[in-house]
Amino acid sequence: MAGHSKWANIKRQKARVDAVKGKVFAKVSRQIIVAARSGADPAGNFQLRTAIEKAKTVGIPNDNIERAIAKGSGQLNDGSQLEEIRYEGYGAGGIAIIIEALTDNRNRTAADLRSAFTKNGGNLGETGCVSWMFDQKGVVSITGSYDEDELLEASVEGEAEYYEVIAEDDFQGVEVFTETTNLENLSQVLQEKGFDISEVEFRWVSAHTIEVSDPEQARSLLKLMDALDDLDDVQNITANFDIANKLLKTLAS
């Protein structure tokens, strides 16, 4: 949608801030720990391989990566056990929000999330209350120059569903979408065709996006997203709203 910044693009901006804060190290390390449960060899574990590549991209030292793999695969036992949990809730104006968390204490995480929602005009709901508004997809992000005919051909070969050209200040490239079960195949095909892949991920994609034009609602939503993202147990946040770039700049000033 021209002139608008989708939540995925807002998340990219936040990711850069998180990287400066060092917060991204902890989140990616946790992804490695969970992925390594299915096997410590990245050659046979696509989820682990993807997490390791992301860790290297953000500059996590190899020693930290190896330690996370050892912890996840059971070679290093510190007594803690991370659990993957999905939470769902509503922001100001009924905006749907999905939170993916990794936690060793689900009671603590639920309490922290409930507090963040309550303080920022939202409420934590029951599992399933908003996830029906989203589909989970596999997404391959491509940066750099590309030939669109070659991209279309590779997307068909890799069994992609569709792709979107992204032209934002913080990201110039293409996002290619597929079924989650086909993500490994698609990323491999695109890599073999020589495309510059910046990220491979699973993402919740909303069927219908709500445009937020009211400044107070937008401010409340962004404060809620920040509060949720600041929680150590939170790995990923997805919401079904857009905010016009002009309004975003006004709120940031």
Swiss-Prot record:
InterPro entries: Integrase-like_N, TACO1_YebC-like_2nd/3rd_dom, TACO1_YebC_N, Transcrip_reg_TACO1-like, Transcrip_reg_TACO1-like_dom3, YebC-like. It is found in: Cytoplasm. It comes from the Bacteria. GO terms for biological process: regulation of DNA-templated transcription. Coiled coil: none annotated. Its main location: cytoplasm. The keyword Transcription regulation applies. One of its GO terms (molecular function) is DNA binding. One of its GO terms (cellular component) is cytosol. Keywords: Cytoplasm, DNA-binding, Transcription, Transcription regulation. PANTHER family: TRANSCRIPTIONAL REGULATORY PROTEIN YEBC-RELATED, TRANSLATIONAL ACTIVATOR OF CYTOCHROME C OXIDASE 1. NCBIfam families: PRK00110.1, PRK12378.1, YebC/PmpR family DNA-binding transcriptional regulator. Belongs to the TACO1 family. This is Probable transcriptional regulatory protein Tery_2125.
